Amino acid sequence: MSSASYLQRAEAHPSPVASKLLKLMHEKKTNLCASLDVTTTSELLKLVDTLGPYICLLKTHVDILSDFSFENTVKPLKEMAAKHNFLIFEDRKFADIGNTVKLQYTSGVYKIAEWADITNAHGVTGQGIVTGLKQGAEETTNEPRGLLMLAELSSKGSLAHGEYTKGTVDIAKSDKDFVIGFIAQKDMGGRDEGFDWLIMTPGVGLDDKGDALGQQYRTVDEVFSTGTDIIIVGRGLFAKGRDPKTEGERYRKAGWDAYLKRIGN
């Protein structure tokens, strides 16, 4: 795992979007990604405005919004990202052949490539998925875009481990500029070959150990000790009975302290 600071990594990173993210993490002293699975735009925007000061990244699932529109959802989200200085990660989990994912990324109702700084994909269909998504990004926008590969998941019984994970890492090696890292539970190596992958870890909780649908939680210190760079937190920030502002600062501080401990500060 990396013992370099976020700023050191930002200055040397080959990906413009990864460099931008690492830099704002350093500036805001946060490695918290808020995963906000709500079903209306008003709920989403309210939570984003409250949590914005504490996060480096917002993770969305726009296909669960019952009232999604560019004018009323994407435009204010982008304005809040500028106001609070965070990036947007649409958790689309693409998993088809290259031409199909390119169309899913650029077209349809959501036109993800136009507004999401980062998206992600499964490795199950092979290297073509990276090529297709990169082409889609290049043909849609001049803004920097990045892709995360799903190497490991936090759900009980996940098949994403062992040879599957190794194969996904091999796919990531095909594009140093566009593939910026992984959704994973631990460090994925690569530094000896010149890669500096960002590791983003879901299933992080300071209080809960799991849920009835197979989610398994690990503590902030645990995930940083095995190589994470960014913690993805959802219900821990806004579930019933929790104050998003209080929890946002609590997770921000826990993540930042764990990062400082790892780099020896």
UniProtKB/Swiss-Prot annotation:
Catalytic residues (positions): 93 (proton donor)
Top-level EC class as recorded in UniProt: lyase
The entry's keywords: Decarboxylase, Lyase, Pyrimidine biosynthesis
PROSITE patterns in the record: OMPDECASE (PS00156)
A GO CC annotation given for this chain: cytosol
Pathway: Pyrimidine metabolism; UMP biosynthesis via de novo pathway; UMP from orotate: step 2/2
Chain sites annotated for binding substrate: 37, 59-61, 91-100, 217, 235
EC number: 4.1.1.23
Cross-referenced CDD domains: OMP_decarboxylase_like
Top-level lineage group: Eukaryota
InterPro entries: Aldolase_TIM, OMPdecase, OMPdecase_AS, OMPdeCOase_dom, RibuloseP-bd_barrel
GO molecular function: orotidine-5'-phosphate decarboxylase activity
Protein family per UniProt: Belongs to the OMP decarboxylase family.
PANTHER family documented for this protein: OROTIDINE 5'-PHOSPHATE DECARBOXYLASE
Protein name (Swiss-Prot/TrEMBL): Orotidine 5'-phosphate decarboxylase
Originating organism: Candida glabrata (strain ATCC 2001 / BCRC 20586 / JCM 3761 / NBRC 0622 / NRRL Y-65 / CBS 138) (Yeast)
Chain's gene name: URA3
